[in-house]
Amino acid sequence: KLSPSGMKLLGQGTVYAIYAVLAITYLVQVWKIWQVNAHVVKNPVPELQRYSFTQVAILDLAYMVTFGTELAVVSMLALFYVDMFSVDKITAGMLAGSYAVINLIARPAGGLLSDKFGRKVTLIIVFIGIAASFAVVSQVDQTWALPMVILAATFGGIFSKAGSGAVYAMVPLIQRRLTGQIAGMTGAYGNVGGVAFLTVLAMVSTPVFFMTISATAAVTLVFIALFLREPKGHMTEVLPDGTVQLIEVN
């Protein structure tokens, strides 16, 4: 976007230098990853320390959709109201701000529902809601009544924010000794989602942007339904004296 072929804010030499730095950084990270994890490849991992990385990957993808949607939508929602419905900027800002406030209720509710009804079923429900609500928002045009648009966007916000809570309700249950690492990586993918969705918005129309969110949520829903496993039984923790404690996850 900033190169001579885009906004022309950077020279071609600068662009190539940035590409080179990114490539070198990538190679260094690959080498560091191998150094840290080589022992896992060379030696068998104790049974108590094993976990399925597929579960981590699905939660990363899920949080990319839920929190990424929050970041992207709250960044453009006020301008959407101004451009589409000629709402004054103060009102548009207040409406967009109310979208963010939903987080205070919806995210804890997602965690609460996960504890009460199960992690996987809650994730399935909220992702159905995300896909459906943003598919509806993608159909909005100037003939729609503004309250209906606000209602549709609010439902999308409720489901996406509840989804963030539901994702983190499951993160500590993958492998207790790695909870911090798994939580950190999952959280990082939320920012990845925000950048990815806003990049899409920079290249396409607003309806296509909302439909992209809906389609990504639908694909993630399939992965959750087919491959995510509901935590059952017990997780283990090795105490300082070397004994193993079983912790019920249900």
What do the predicted segments below correspond to?
Residues 115-128:
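Cytoplasmic membrane-interface "Motif A"-like loop-to-helix N-cap segments
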Residues 106-118:
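Helix-to-loop junctions at the C-terminal end of transmembrane segments
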Residues 1-14, 54-100:
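Extracytoplasmic gate region of multi-pass secondary transporters
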Residues 100-108, 191, 195:
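Residue-level signature of mid-helix packing/kink "hotspots" within the transmembrane helices
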Residues 176-205:
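A late C-terminal transmembrane helix in Major Facilitator Superfamily
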Residues 128-143:
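C-terminal ends and interior cores of transmembrane alpha-helices
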Residues 12-28, 209-227:
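Symmetry-related core transmembrane helices of the 12-TM Major Facilitator Superfamily/SLC fold
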Residues 161-175:
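Intracellular juxtamembrane helix-capping segments at the cytosolic ends
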